[in-house]
Regions:
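Short loop/turn motifs at secondary-structure junctions and domain boundaries
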Residues: 366-371
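A structural microfeature
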Residues: 387-389
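Generic short beta-strand
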Residues: 374-377
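Detector for small/aliphatic-rich hydrophobic stretches
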Residues: 1-145, 156, 360, 380, ...
């Protein structure tokens, strides 16, 4: 008899802080690939898109810890990593450095991992030790036969570790008596802008919706020095959080309907070139206040990215319990992001080269984000992406 494993990925976007690590380049490759995959299935006229590639990668890395053979190879391919002997330690080091840099100065970053195991299910000692020591995910015995109680227990843990921003991650019916193990990875971040927006300058203005029409939205206004750049198809604005190397980058298409084309060009080397070409400018910025969330299954996306074997009953997760009787039933994702005058809260080729802006410093530069755009929250030291997404409907 085979049983299934469920991965839960409760994300709370809000700002982000990252540090350099051997795991970061692979996470960025995964971040770009995941964005393109999800964007292909959710066009800008269909709504917002929010994900945390860091959280997804972390949860899948925990799963990789117990995978063997072709199943392990598929997960490794999906997360775009070269998972050598020191890989899990590198992921742990990245999380530790993030937490160290993020907290303080009014900012808060919390990363929490959980391992929920059916009572009486014996685990391999090496798997359990790696989960406990590197991923800080202690084993919690739970009775999945008591389905509703198990669901509520894990949902309560998720809410607790996301400042109550992620509620009811598991809907009724998503956990059943066949569940044997649940992996959870939760992130909460609150970051204050280095240069806050004055609420007195916030006013209601029209935003061009992805599906056509407009919505009346509160826009924050500020004229200040920002890192700014342009590509032939987009403007790029970077807003920093105080006391950290983390920034919020907006990729704003130059046309109202240009986001889909821009999203197709998102690749690690493209983003690196764009962000690396930014320069300080005095910019008149108009940014919408918004609060949005995404909730969807990642199962189909991850299958397309190479790990279909993990979802089959023939999967090899013998590194978890010593037997080949486990497979992944679902990978659930839920994300939240809120941007306001004070900061951010969240529980994320061609035309690579930047071109020089032919302008004098005193010339007027306007950045008006009044139509669908993409955003990234990343560490500017390593370039690692913690959160990414698309805003197409600010009122959603």
């Amino acid at each position: 008899m085979t049983h299934h494993v469920t991965l839960t990925l409760p994300f709370l976007l809000a700002g982000a802080l990252l540090a350099s690590s051997d795991a970061a380049p692979g996470m960025n490759r995964f971040a770009a690939a995941a964005y393109r995959q999800l964007a292909q299935n959710l066009a800008p006229d269909k709504g917002n898109l929010i994900l945390s590639p860091f959280s997804i990668s972390t949860a899948l890395s925990m799963l990789l810890n117990g995978a063997r053979g072709q199943t392990a190879a598929g997960i490794t391919a999906a997360i775009e990593q070269h998972a050598g002997p020191g890989y899990h330690a590198a992921v742990a080091a990245l999380a530790a450095e993030l937490t160290k840099q993020a907290n303080g100065g009014g900012n808060q970053l919390a990363i929490a991992n959980g391992l929920w195991v059916q009572q009486g299910l014996p685990l391999q000692s090496e798997f359990e030790q790696t989960m406990r020591t590197l991923y800080a995910a202690p084993l919690t015995p739970i009775d999945f036969q008591a389905v509703e109680q198990a669901r509520q227990t894990i949902n309560a843990w998720t809410a607790q570790h996301t400042n109550d921003r992620i509620q009811d991650l598991f809907a009724r019916g998503s956990i059943d008596a066949g569940t044997r193990l649940v992996l959870t990875s939760a992130i909460y971040f609150y970051g204050k802008w280095h240069s806050p927006f004055d609420p007195q300058n916030t006013r209601v203005e029209p935003f061009q919706l992805g599906g056509g029409g407009t919505a009346e939205v509160k826009f924050m206004h500020q004229k200040a020095d920002f890192l700014y750049g342009e590509t032939p198809a987009a403007q790029i604005l970077e807003m920093k959080y105080q006391g950290t190397p983390v920034a919020f980058d907006i990729l704003l298409p130059k046309t109202n309907d240009g986001l889909a084309e821009l999203e197709r060009s998102i690749k690690p080397e493209v983003l690196s070139a764009w962000f690396g070409g930014l320069a300080s400018r005095k910019v008149e910025a108009a940014i919408p206040k918004f609060r949005a969330e995404s909730a969807f299954s990642l199962k189909d996306m991850l299958s397309r990215m190479g790990m279909a074997d993990a979802f089959e009953r023939t999967a090899d997760f013998s590194g978890i319990d010593g037997r080949r009787d486990l497979f992944v039933g679902e990978v659930a994702h839920k994300a939240f992001v809120e941007v306001s005058e004070e900061g951010t809260e969240a529980a994320a080729a061609t035309g690579i080269a930047m071109h020089a802006l032919a302008m004098r410093r005193e010339e007027r530069t306007v950045f008006r984000a009044d139509h669908p755009f993409a955003f990234f929250i990343r560490d500017t030291t390593s370039g690692a992406i913690l959160f990414e997404g698309r805003l197409a409907q600010p009122a959603s």
